[in-house]
Amino acid sequence: MMKGQLAGLMRQAQQMQENMKKAQDALADILVEGAAGGGLVKVTMSCRNDVKRIAIDPSLLADDKDMLEDLVAAAFNDALRKAEATSQEKMSALTAGLPLPPGMKLPF
């Protein structure tokens, strides 16, 4: 490989690294909402998996504690799946054409 080609590859790698960092930073601003119990429990989180808000309908507060805990867990898991899917979608544009192993999640 010639020096010019190597320098070009290094510039491309550096540019891709900068683009990945920008995309990862942008994911912190994208919010998704998971819900359970027909929307009685909602979890809002960023695509960086930071929980921002949990909303519980007041009608559930007098109900069974175990059921409420299950609904919170289900809403959290729903939000997490949505955050992961959104992250993968946003990051896939940056990795198009790269030979990544199947199932590899980004950002790393």
UniProtKB/Swiss-Prot annotation:
It is found in: Cytoplasm, Nucleoid. GO terms for molecular function: DNA binding. GO terms for cellular component: bacterial nucleoid; cytosol. Pfam families: YbaB_DNA_bd. Keywords: Cytoplasm, DNA-binding. InterPro entries: YbaB-like_sf, YbaB/EbfC. It comes from the Bacteria. SUPFAM superfamilies: YbaB-like. HAMAP family: DNA_YbaB_EbfC. Binds to DNA and alters its conformation. May be involved in regulation of gene expression, nucleoid organization and DNA protection. NCBIfam families: DNA_YbaB_EbfC (TIGR00103). Homodimer. Belongs to the YbaB/EbfC family. This is Nucleoid-associated protein BAV0915.
